[in-house]
C-alpha cells in the first residue's frame, strides 16, 4: 500500500512538473512574440515624422519614442491638431493641447527646434534655449525659417503626421 502511494505521488509530481515546464515554454514563446511586436513599434516610431505648419510655412520634425509621442501620434492619426500658441519669455511658444498625455519628464536643456510636453498638456516649441523638466516630443529637422515663422506674439500651429 505504501509503495502504491509513493508511486502515485511520484506520478502526480512528474505530471505537475511537466505541465509547469510546458507552460513556461509557452510563456517564453509568447514573450518572444510580444518583444518582436514592441520592436516593430519602436522601429516605426524612430522614423516617424510630423509636420508643423505655421502660417504658410511647414517644417518636418522627427519624433521621439515615448508614451506621450505615441498618444500624440494617435491623436494626429484621427485629425490634424491645431494649437494657438503664445510667446513666453522670448525663447518659446506655448499652447494647450486640450488634454493630458503621459509624461516622462527629465531635466533637459532645450535647443531651437525642440518640441516638448510641459505639465502634461502644454506643447512647447523652442526658438531659443531653456533648462527645465520636460517630456521630449520631437525636433524640427531643418531650422531654416523656423524663428521667423514663430515671429513675435501668438501663432497657430497645426501638427499632422507626415505620410
Task: Locate predicted features.
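Second-shell loop/turn segments in exported
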Residues: 55-62
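Short, compositionally biased
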Residues: 127-142
Amino acid at each position: 500500500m505504501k509503495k502504491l502511494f509513493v508511486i502515485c505521488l511520484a506520478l502526480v509530481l512528474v505530471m505537475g512538473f511537466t505541465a509547469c515546464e510546458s507552460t513556461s515554454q509557452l510563456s517564453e514563446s509568447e514573450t518572444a512574440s510580444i518583444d518582436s511586436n514592441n520592436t516593430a513599434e519602436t522601429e516605426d516610431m524612430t522614423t516617424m515624422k510630423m509636420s508643423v505648419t505655421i502660417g504658410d510655412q511647414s517644417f518636418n520634425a522627427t519624433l521621439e519614442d515615448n508614451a506621450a509621442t505615441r498618444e500624440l501620434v494617435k491623436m494626429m492619426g484621427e485629425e490634424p491638431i491645431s494649437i494657438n500658441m503664445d510667446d513666453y519669455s522670448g525663447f518659446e511658444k506655448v499652447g494647450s493641447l486640450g488634454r493630458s498625455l503621459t509624461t516622462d519628464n527629465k531635466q533637459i536643456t532645450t535647443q531651437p527646434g525642440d518640441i516638448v510636453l510641459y505639465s502634461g498638456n502644454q506643447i512647447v516649441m523652442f526658438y531659443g534655449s531653456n533648462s527645465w523638466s520636460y517630456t521630449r516630443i520631437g525636433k524640427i529637422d531643418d531650422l531654416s525659417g523656423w524663428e521667423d515663422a514663430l515671429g513675435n506674439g501668438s501663432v497657430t500651429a497645426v501638427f499632422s503626421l507626415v505620410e
